[in-house]
């Protein structure tokens, strides 16, 4: 009789040998017609008309131009995308300093204003819950609810620089709360309600929010979890909290006793909406996100309005080819930066699809059923989710019509070459698979997809435009075809504005810039391939 642990080890070795055989195999190529119609081709034509630079359809040539002329790149992208705001005269100050560089230091804009432009009857949000609830909001309905809540905030003195903390499920109210906070010039910070009291208070307690927004509970895998007790303790633990908004997500009549100035979320959307958006500086805070906290209290990472706006628009349009004709979904909670990234889809006119709950409830078909129902074109999940679907023996395209899906995105951990092959064999043979990698630290990606390049098994397609990413050896020298440290050699707009409560930027510098002086070392082992692709091997700072 074979020992089970021995069998498991044999299976792993077999999988590893198979993955080695698949690694680098060509799995998909864009047709010339497809490439010609992409957003990045439109942008490249814009650049050629203004600078004379001709990419000749070569994405890697465009990448090289974008990092050699990184300030020009971001300046041209602002204009091509049509950022709503005043760009100001200066494009950068302290241009080579890492940290210290500031893009568009004179610019003013509002993230919410950019997100809520063209408030018409087109779909904005399609939100699903594991229990079958489904809510849809048009762009006009979304803006109306945002401006009403923003008016309530304004009337209570919440404005520029004030923090709003949200202990919240992945539901439309989360998007509304975030946009209302931005509309008044505030700073939004969120975590999901599966966090316990310690996890939530360790994060929110550091930033001293004036307003706490919370849902009364959540459900997962068919079980209901009441969170009102934790909400009371959380509010009590933060003397800065002046009021609490409660979203009755699991109960129509949540018990709000013991809370400071409690109000139901819908009751805060009154008859005195905000008339106009509060524009703030390009480098003023929009979000506070958090490190994992595995080596102490979570670090509070502050991201700026302009950096998020520019970087997300770039990644959505130029790398992911998202347009107003698409449907964008990423399986995430409000405690992961992919929520912030996905929500930015509203800025490019695409409806976003939310899912709250267990992605395997009642079975592995759940998200694929939703994808078919909503006609999702851009479908994002974690690499671990893909592995779970494979291990469950579920073959999505045998059960659901996924013909609308033209891009899959995977992140959170490296996607194996075998998982690449599974996606093309069992989900859709004619889609672009984008394994992407970046993180909370930059609220975006260092390496991601290219709609005009082929997909090779086990490889991320390209480095981000405007991102001077390279792989360095232990002496800080660039290397190709060998493992090294993934680094960024030049400033970029979505670098953190700062860490909260970090005098002199000591923690900020220690986090990224001390291993190689003045260079962002990200903490990933990676290999740059000869064709410009990236293979992520795992953490180098674990």
Regions found by a protein language model. Name each.
Residues 131, 214-282, 392-393:
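ANL superfamily adenylate-forming
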Residues 478-480, 487-542:
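Conserved ATP-binding/catalytic segment of the ANL
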Residues 309-327, 337-377, 392:
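Conserved AMP-binding/adenylation subdomain of ANL enzymes
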Residues 350, 376-381, 390-455, 468:
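Gly/Ser/Thr-rich phosphate-binding loop
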Residues 121-123, 244-246, 257-290, 297, ...:
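Conserved pre-ATP/AMP-binding loop-to-beta segment of ANL
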Residues 49-54, 112-138, 251-255:
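AMP-dependent adenylate-forming
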Residues 60-65, 112, 125-179, 196-201, ...:
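Conserved AMP-binding/adenylate-forming core of the ANL superfamily
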Residues 208-212, 229-244, 326-328, 353, ...:
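Conserved helix-loop-beta element of the AMP-binding
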